């Protein structure tokens, strides 16, 4: 057998082995939070777009929610606007909010839409302001030290939390064979804009759609134990225990809480996925080779 024919045979074998997985997910909705290194490398960006198009082609319904923190930071720096963070959240005054909307809704969103469409998909870019897709309210942040008798309320500007998702719009797009690509900008009761963490938006979208899976692309191999070993499969109870004993802490806490709440809210499973791995999404859904940490009501087989 020639090398060319051997390569073709291997490709056919892989496609054949993927059939049971394709059947499992046909007609199901998967919400993917896209961010980190996967958005910065040209090779990974192209791979992501092709993976999304392939999912749609075999009958799976991907819904993409994207971040864009580094891009926002870059433009703020070029405009000589200082960035401030409190508890990992960007303090968002009116001027910063204008930049957030410009970058997320105008630049990053349209770049992703264009890339997916160039590879044969039919992506539609949205922000939470379109048809009030993401209804939001101002996020209240409090802080208390032992010396305080009352918690201090900290104003971090136009940072919001999700209070509702327009599922009618998303279902209409999905049934029309479109791929929604969502920028995490919410709209308040009076039309005001809110900057919302993309992980949180993805989790709430997954809950609202009763998605089969929430996939959070990150820059790490997955959730690790205290010895640095990746934990490939966890139940919701085990996640609670790891938070309580301090294994999960710091910057991973909000992401893990988001994944946990999604499963508790009716999503089939959540996945902390290594976005640095080429075709990570396909490896997860079409093979037994996990590339991250699965959180569900039962262990990964």
From Swiss-Prot:
Assigned EC number: 2.7.2.8
Gene Ontology terms describing biological process: arginine biosynthetic process via ornithine; L-arginine biosynthetic process
Gene Ontology MF annotations: acetylglutamate kinase activity; ATP binding
Highest taxon in the source lineage: Bacteria
Site (Transition state stabilizer): 33, 255
Catalytic activity: N-acetyl-L-glutamate + ATP = N-acetyl-L-glutamyl 5-phosphate + ADP
List of residues binding substrate: 68-69, 90, 195
Pathway(s) the chain acts in: Amino-acid biosynthesis; L-arginine biosynthesis; N(2)-acetyl-L-ornithine from L-glutamate: step 2/4
Keyword terms: Amino-acid biosynthesis, Arginine biosynthesis, ATP-binding, Cytoplasm, Kinase, Nucleotide-binding, Transferase
InterPro entries: AceGlu_kinase-like_sf (IPR036393), AcgluKinase_fam (IPR004662), ArgB (IPR037528), Asp/Glu/Uridylate_kinase (IPR001048), Glu/AcGlu_kinase (IPR001057), NAGK-C (IPR041727)
Localisation per UniProt entry: Cytoplasm
GO cellular component, one term: cytoplasm
Similarity remark: Belongs to the acetylglutamate kinase family. ArgB subfamily.
Role description: Catalyzes the ATP-dependent phosphorylation of N-acetyl-L-glutamate.
UniProt-listed HAMAP family: ArgB
Name of this protein: Acetylglutamate kinase
Organism in which the protein naturally occurs: Pseudomonas fluorescens (strain SBW25)
């Amino acid at each position: 057998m020639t090398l060319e024919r051997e390569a073709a045979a291997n490709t056919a074998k892989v496609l054949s082995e993927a059939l049971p997985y394709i059947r499992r997910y046909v007609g199901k909705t998967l919400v993917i939070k896209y961010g980190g290194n996967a958005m910065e490398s040209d090779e990974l960006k192209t791979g992501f777009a092709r993976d999304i198009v392939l999912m749609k082609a075999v009958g799976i319904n991907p819904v993409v929610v994207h971040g864009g923190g580094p891009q926002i930071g870059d433009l703020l720096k070029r405009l000589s606007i200082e960035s401030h963070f409190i508890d990992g959240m960007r303090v968002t005054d009116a001027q910063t909010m204008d930049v957030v909307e410009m970058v997320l809704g105008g630049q990053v969103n349209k770049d992703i839409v264009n890339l997916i469409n160039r590879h044969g998909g039919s992506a539609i870019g949205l922000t939470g302001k379109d048809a009030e897709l993401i209804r939001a309210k101002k996020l209240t942040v409090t802080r208390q030290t032992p010396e305080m008798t009352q918690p201090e309320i900290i104003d971090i500007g136009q940072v919001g939390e999700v209070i509702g998702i327009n599922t009618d719009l998303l279902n209409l797009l999905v049934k029309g064979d479109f791929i929604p690509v969502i920028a995490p900008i919410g709209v308040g009761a009076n039309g005001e804009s809110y900057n919302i963490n993309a992980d949180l938006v993805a989790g709430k979208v997954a809950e609202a759609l009763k998605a089969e899976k929430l996939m959070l692309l990150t820059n790490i191999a997955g959730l690790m134990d205290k010895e640095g070993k990746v934990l490939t499969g966890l139940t919701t109870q085990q996640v609670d225990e790891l938070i309580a004993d301090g294994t999960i802490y710091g910057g991973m806490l909000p992401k893990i809480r988001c994944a946990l709440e999604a499963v508790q809210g009716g999503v089939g499973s959540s996945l902390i996925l290594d976005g640095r791995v080429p075709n990570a999404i396909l490896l997860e859904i079409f093979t037994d080779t996990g590339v991250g940490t699965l959180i569900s009501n039962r262990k990964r087989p």
